[in-house]
Curated annotation (Swiss-Prot):
NCBIfam families associated with the record: PRK00049.1, PRK12735.1, PRK12736.1
Annotated compartments: Cytoplasm
Molecular-function annotations in GO: GTP binding; GTPase activity; translation elongation factor activity
Protein name: Elongation factor Tu
Length: 270
């Protein structure tokens, strides 16, 4: 990922939140872009901001001393200033060199979270999204899972960047043409998956760490029957929390095992 920090303002509270979030969701590496350097005349101030960012990264177990830091100005680059255009190229080179290329999970059963749905006159309904794992070939059956009863359809076309393909694999952003499916029968938050490979659930157990106020989380405790939103791939669903017997409440900063009952079924895996 690219962490953007204003050279004029230095790390802000949301900078800490972004680093923490990156750590918690498993982002493997970060590259820093110090933006708006054209507004800073003092070289020592720039060095101070860079040191602050490196310290913050180290605080959350990123290798702060080793992370590439590129100083530039996005606005000046957009205005055609060659000096700052070079900095953007330098940034992208750092991304290529420092951030590991993700491995495509192509051998497992096909699964694609649905991001958007639209109709093509005369052709049918298209679901778009990024293939999370596996492969899909034209003519193969898939299940539409989550939010409603599971249904089955056939992928009659695969399109990427306005080109028709015979198949798609993990990492591809595609549109999948679905046979005999009405526009209202598929929606964001569902998944397309190889038949029998994943099932919808409304109830699950989870081990949870509750972010503290300093980490951008809660200010107050919560109790059983608390109803937060739970995020799954491309959607969020309300769930009712049940705390373990004998646990009256959970404070920010606590670890807890809880049972959650969702108000709609979602494709969930361990």
């Amino acid at each position: 990922g690219i962490l953007v920090v204003s050279a004029a303002d230095g790390p802000m509270p949301q900078t800490r939140e972004h680093i923490l979030l990156s750590r918690n969701v498993g982002v493997p590496a970060l590259v820093v872009f110090l933006n708006k350097v054209d507004m800073v005349d003092d070289e020592e101030l720039l060095e101070l901001v860079e040191m602050e960012v490196r310290d913050l990264l180290s605080e959350y177990d990123f290798p702060g001393d080793d992370v590439p830091v590129i100083a530039g100005s996005a606005l000046k680059a957009l205005e055609g200033d060659e000096k700052y255009e070079e900095k953007i190229l330098e940034l992208m080179q750092a991304v290529d060199d420092y951030i590991p290329t993700p491995e495509r999970d192509s051998d497992k059963p096909f699964m694609m979270p649905v991001e958007d749905v639209f109709s093509i006159t005369g052709r049918g309904t298209v679901a778009t999204g990024r293939v999370e794992r596996g492969q899909i070939k034209v003519g193969e059956e898939v299940e539409i899972i989550g939010l409603h009863d599971t249904s089955k359809t056939t992928v009659t076309g695969v399109e990427m960047f306005r080109k028709l393909l015979d198949y798609a694999e993990a990492g591809d952003n595609i549109g999948a043409l679905l046979r005999g499916v009405a526009r209202e029968d598929v929606q964001r938050g569902q998944v397309l998956a190889a038949p029998g490979s994943i099932t919808p659930h409304t109830k699950f157990k989870a081990e949870v760490y509750v972010l503290s106020k300093d980490e951008g989380g809660r200010h107050t405790p919560f109790f059983s029957n608390y109803r937060p939103q739970f995020y799954f791939r491309t959607t969020d669903v309300t769930g009712v929390v049940q705390l373990p017997e004998g646990t009256e409440m959970v404070m920010p900063g606590d670890n807890v095992e809880m049972t959650v009952e969702l108000i709609a079924p979602i494709a969930i895996e361990d």
